[in-house]
Amino acid sequence: MPKEGMRMAVSIATLKSVLGEKVSESASVLEAHGRDENFPEVRPPMAVVFAADVADVRATLAWCREQCVPLIPFGAGTSLEGSLVPYEAGAPMLSLDLSRMRRVLEVQPENFLAVVEPGITRTALNTELRHTGLFFPVDPGADASIGGMAATNASGTTTVRYGGMRQNVLALEVVLANGEVLRLGRPVRKTSSGYDLKDLFIGSAGTLGVITRVTVRLHPVPEHVHTLRVFFPSIVEAAQAAYAVMASALPVARLELVDELGIRSINRYLGRGYEEKPCLFVEFHSSTAAAIEDEVRLAEELMREAGALDVAVARTSEERTAQWEARHQVYWALVNLFPGQTYTITDTVVPLARVPELVAYTQEILGEMGMEGSIVGHVGDGNFHTLIATPREDYARAQEFSGRLVRRALELDGTSTGEHGIGLTKRAYMAEEHGAALEWMRRLKALFDPDNLLNPGKIL
């Protein structure tokens, strides 16, 4: 065995002496922790630690400091942009899997909050809450872990009404690289006390500390929910209609766009018979039947004035479930439509009034570059994704497309990422987006993680 390999074997043995069977070197486990949802290659870590509690997290970090081995926190594995993989292939790296830390520690219905461990998924949390009349609203589509959602500042289909993770996390417990445990935030709706370190850690992608406890805000389950499915002659007209809805001040709960290619893939994948035209999925939540019927009526009038071809209203839970299944399955429907391809997902955000312009630009460069891509997203908050299918050897062209779209978004006062994070794939745009502030981000990283042990090579 080469000396380096022998040193690593001895090191892992010392880790196992502390954590025992919680440490895995199984090839299948390593492979599962060396990928995310869309990074084009697998980069396995040297070992995976399945932490059961804060003591395990601290013990793992102590070993990492002693051995000078970096660590990547891992939740449900639904991350994007290479956030979960080592910064380079073959780099010695440990994966800290938090999925066993999945308890609901406390629910306070009277205060509309719950305290959870990081490994619980949003679906599991809402199952635990089903008898309280409350729910956790942040819905990124994937059944992500709450800790991972906090680490990426996740958002999704309901953000337009309920906000993303920063708006729905009241407090955090984090373990720093030096093993110190910090408790950030208080279980209150607002505070003006001190610097907001809680929000600094939300969206930090495990580069500043390991999240070990999350206090989340809960919301009443809406008594009445109606959903509209609205088809348009073109995707730009659909985007313009979405802006009209937002400008009307109607209390929309979800406002999602799926283009013609996305609808076609849904029809084939799920056996639906939707008209193969660009579509808006619009949802309203209300406490009274009369109010929601008024909202739906006004929305339908707005849509028809904006050029809608057809408006279908889903009033039953079965109809709504089928409709949102279609929206959430677009990615897998496209994978099914283009088998054997590599998939790149963009994540730009622009001010609401600029969404139609960026949608039109996206269509233009897809055509110019001769690429297959579907435009899907949360246009109610200015965020949409382009799902691009290319042969593996064309991955560089897909990244070129992504770069052109990011730079156009920045020109329109937007951002390179609304919810997926920077990871490995968008670091090149950080200076362009943040200017001199990027150096202060580097200083913060050095302050919290002076040895660069926590998810190195990401964001900065």
Model-derived segments and spans:
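N-terminal flexible segment immediately upstream of the FAD-binding catalytic core
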Residues: 2-62, 79-112, 262-270, 317-345, ...
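Alpha-helix capping/hinge segments and adjacent helical runs
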Residues: 21, 410-422, 435, 450-454
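C-terminal substrate-recognition/cap domain of FAD-linked oxidoreductases
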Residues: 25-33, 220, 226, 230-404, ...
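FAD-binding subdomain of flavoenzyme oxidoreductases
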Residues: 103-256, 453-455
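Activity-critical C-terminal alpha-helical subdomain
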Residues: 180, 427-460
